[in-house]
C-alpha cells in the first residue's frame, strides 16, 4: 500500500477536485493524507481523510483564511497580484514546514496542485515522485495563446504572438517573488534550480481537469499533460434550495464566479445586464460568497 500526500490550496474548487482523486486512490487500496494551509475544511474529514497543517507559525490558519476572504472582493490585476502575494507567503510556509511534516507522516508520493508552486520542491527534497494537477485554467506558458488572465482571443498572427509573449513575460515578473524563494531553497539543498515556472511542475505527469476542447489551441503543450475532464465525486453535492416553479421552458444561462471571487456584486450585475432582452432565463450562483438578497433586484 502506498501513502499518497496531497498539497493544494485550501479552497473548495481545489479541495473538492483533489477529494475526487483521493477517493479513487483510496479505492485502489492506498492511503491518502491532505497537507493544507489554513483551517481544515469539514469536507475532508467527512470523506474520511486526514489533514495535516503546513502553516505552522509562518502562515497561521487565521491569517490564511483572512487573505482569501479579501481576495473574494478583488478583481482583474488587483486580484492577480493579491493571489500571488498569498502564494509568496504560502511558499515560505511550505518550504520551511512542509518537508519535515511530510517526512513524519511517511508519505511515499505526492499529488501537487499546479498553483501550489513549492510542492514539487518538497517532493524533490524528500526524493518522492510527484504528479501535478491543474484544478484551474492550465497555467503552462505558451506564446501561441494569450495568458489566462487576459480577455484576448487567440490569433495566428505575428503581432499576436509578440503580444502574448510580452504578457507571459509580465506574468513571470509577478511570479518572481515565489520563484526566487523556490530557487534559493533548492540552491541551498543542491537541487537543480528552475529557470522558469514550467520547471517546477512534474516532468512525469500533469493532469488538467479541463476538457481538452475548452483549452485554446496550443503549440507548446508539454507531452506529460493529460486532459481528463472535471474531477468530482457524486457525494460532493449538497442540496440547495431552488425555485423550480419559476422555470418556464426557455434556455437557461448559468453564471458563477467560482469559489474565490464570488463576492463581487458589481460583476453579477454586469452579467444580469448583459442578459437583459435575451429570450432566456439567467441563473446566478453566488455560492457561499454572498447571499442572493445582497444583490438586490437585478
Functional labels for PLM-detected ranges:
Residues 131-216, 222:
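Active-site-proximal region of nucleotide-activated glycan assembly enzymes
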Residues 210-298:
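Donor-nucleotide binding loops and adjacent catalytic segments primarily
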Residues 1-53:
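N-terminal subdomain of nucleotide-sugar transferases
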Residues 35-37, 54-57, 113, 133-136, ...:
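Generic beta-sheet signal
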Residues 88-161, 213-214:
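Conserved nucleotide-sugar donor-interacting segment of glycosyltransferase catalytic cores
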Amino acid at each position: 500500500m502506498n501513502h499518497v500526500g496531497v498539497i493544494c490550496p485550501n479552497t473548495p474548487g481545489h479541495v473538492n477536485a483533489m477529494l475526487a482523486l483521493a477517493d479513487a486512490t483510496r479505492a485502489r487500496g492506498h492511503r491518502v493524507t491532505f497537507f493544507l494551509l489554513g483551517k481544515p475544511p469539514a469536507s475532508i474529514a467527512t470523506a474520511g481523510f486526514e489533514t495535516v497543517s503546513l502553516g505552522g507559525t509562518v502562515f497561521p490558519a487565521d491569517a490564511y483564511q483572512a487573505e482569501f476572504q479579501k481576495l473574494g472582493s478583488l478583481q482583474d490585476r488587483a486580484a492577480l497580484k493579491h493571489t500571488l502575494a498569498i502564494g509568496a507567503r504560502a511558499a515560505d510556509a511550505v518550504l520551511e514546514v512542509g518537508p519535515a511534516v511530510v517526512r513524519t507522516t511517511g508519505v511515499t508520493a505526492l499529488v501537487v496542485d499546479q498553483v501550489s508552486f513549492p510542492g514539487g520542491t518538497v517532493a524533490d527534497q524528500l526524493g518522492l515522485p510527484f504528479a501535478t494537477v491543474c484544478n484551474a485554467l492550465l497555467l503552462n506558458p505558451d506564446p501561441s495563446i494569450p495568458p489566462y488572465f487576459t480577455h484576448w482571443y487567440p490569433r495566428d498572427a505575428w503581432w499576436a504572438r509578440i503580444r502574448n509573449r510580452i504578457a507571459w513575460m509580465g506574468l513571470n515578473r509577478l511570479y518572481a517573488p515565489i520563484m526566487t524563494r523556490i530557487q534559493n531553497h533548492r540552491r541551498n539543498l543542491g537541487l537543480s534550480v528552475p529557470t522558469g515556472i514550467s520547471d517546477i511542475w512534474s516532468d512525469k505527469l500533469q493532469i488538467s481537469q479541463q476538457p481538452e476542447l475548452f483549452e485554446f489551441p496550443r503549440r507548446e503543450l508539454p507531452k506529460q499533460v493529460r486532459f481528463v475532464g472535471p474531477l468530482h465525486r457524486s457525494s460532493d453535492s449538497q442540496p440547495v434550495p431552488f425555485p423550480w416553479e419559476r422555470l418556464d421552458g426557455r434556455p437557461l444561462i448559468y453564471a458563477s464566479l467560482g469559489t474565490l471571487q464570488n463576492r463581487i456584486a458589481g460583476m453579477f450585475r454586469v452579467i444580469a445586464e448583459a442578459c437583459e432582452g435575451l429570450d432566456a432565463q439567467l441563473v446566478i450562483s453566488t455560492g457561499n460568497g454572498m447571499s442572493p438578497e445582497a444583490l438586490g433586484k437585478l
